[in-house]
Amino acid sequence: GFNATYNEREITQLTAVDDPTYLGILTGGISGGVGNNIQIHSVGQTPNAFFVHEQVYDQDGNPIEGVYVDRSGDGRIGSADLHHFKSPMPNYYLGLSSEFIYGDWYLSFAGRAHFDNYVYNNVSSMNGELSRLYRPEGPYLANVTTDALDVMFNGAQYFSSYYVQNGSFFKMDHITLGYNFYDLAGIGANMTVSATVQNAFMITQYEGLDPEVANGIDDNIYPRPRVFVLNVNLQF
């Protein structure tokens, strides 16, 4: 079977009286800093839209630390330069399942996909700067994410659009392969042997552990396990 869904969302009203100057409701608290929110509810936008600074990149496509687009044109970077950028909610949902039978063999599987959704990589924004590597209070070395060597940020850049990453994915939820044995030993016994893997694999461009996170913020989620099951069913 196959199914596909398209969803489009837009906030149409937040105040009792229409107020074009009302920016919206900040939400989406993140780890790092004090009281930082990375999302906003605004009229004309999707719920929980990311609210960040537009990152500037060098000619090689690398983000430049602390350099953002001055959207307000006032010559400095501040809250007036934050802008709505992408949505954590997928526009497209796909589901796929099927079963194949060949002789006494059978194969079944089920998968699903989300497309056009984005994730704020809070794990990377919190642990991806070089200043965290050496801790003088110990002194000791601390863990940082691998992209710290890619971006070479010396300090935290929590509101950089760099950390809002494509979260589209396809997940194969389970695959089962089985075989039916009939009339074992001539005594009329039947047996089915099957092997199943749950959370078989995932295809995604997301740089974090798993793009399927609540409200589009990846903040140290517990990894989903891959489970292997062997089933033997004997009938007399």
Residue ranges and their predicted role:
Residues 1, 95-97, 174-178, 229-231:
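Membrane-embedded beta-strand positions in outer-membrane beta-barrel channels/transporters
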Residues 1-88, 208:
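Conserved small-residue
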Residues 2, 109, 193-195, 232:
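Membrane-embedded beta-strand positions of outer-membrane beta-barrel proteins
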Residues 4-10, 102-104, 113-117, 174, ...:
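Transmembrane beta-strands of outer-membrane beta-barrel pores
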Residues 9-30, 117-144, 203-211:
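Outer-membrane beta-barrel and related beta-rich outer-membrane complex signature
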Residues 60-62, 114-198:
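Extracytoplasmic gating/loop element in the C-terminal half of outer-membrane beta-barrel translocons
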Residues 104-108, 184-185:
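Repeated loop/turn-to-beta-strand initiation elements of outer-membrane beta-barrel proteins
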Residues 224-236:
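Outer-membrane beta-barrel "beta-signal"
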